[in-house]
Design a protein with these regions (language model features):
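Short glycine-rich, Thr/Ser-proximal phosphate-binding strand/loop in the N-terminal lobe
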Residues: 3-47, 87-94
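Glycine-rich phosphate-binding/catalytic subdomain of phosphoryl-transfer
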Residues: 59-133
């Protein structure tokens, strides 16, 4: 493997880096703001814009350097739900949205203990289970 394209979706920015696997050196990097949208049922991220950004720059990286593999990294509280066609079923919740806290008592009654999950109970949507609940 020579060049790995790394998709890194962070809270502030979405980034695409092309990394040489031998020396782990970034040879190309592009970023775009990860803006929280306020329309829809709750604060969420604009995934359509990210998709177009990544497609365009992956093609550019392929043309300029070649891409041998793609790796994705993101915050562990970031998820999307897909429908039977593979399309988004719901917008991707901003995991700092306090909406899940309004259902905290119900969720906490169902949530297994840390000794079972290995995951601490966190506020807002920082636990995927709280988002889905």
């Amino acid at each position: 493997m020579k060049h790995v394209a790394v998709i890194d979706i962070g809270k502030t920015n979405a980034k695409l880096a092309l990394v040489e696997s031998e020396g782990l050196r970034e040879i190309a990097v592009v970023t775009r703001p990860n803006v929280v949208l306020q329309d829809g049922p709750y604060p969420h991220f604009g995934l359509d814009g990210h998709w177009q950004f990544f497609l365009r720059h992956l093609a550019d990286f392929q043309s300029a350097h070649g891409v041998d593999a793609i790796s994705v990294t993101t915050h562990g509280a970031s998820i999307v739900l897909l429908d039977e066609n593979g399309d988004l079923a719901t917008p991707m919740l901003d995991y700092e949205h306090t909406g899940p806290d309004t259902l905290a008592a119900e969720y906490d009654a169902l949530r297994p203990d840390f000794s079972v999950t290995g995951s601490a109970r966190l506020p807002m949507g920082l636990n995927v289970g709280a988002q889905v609940h």
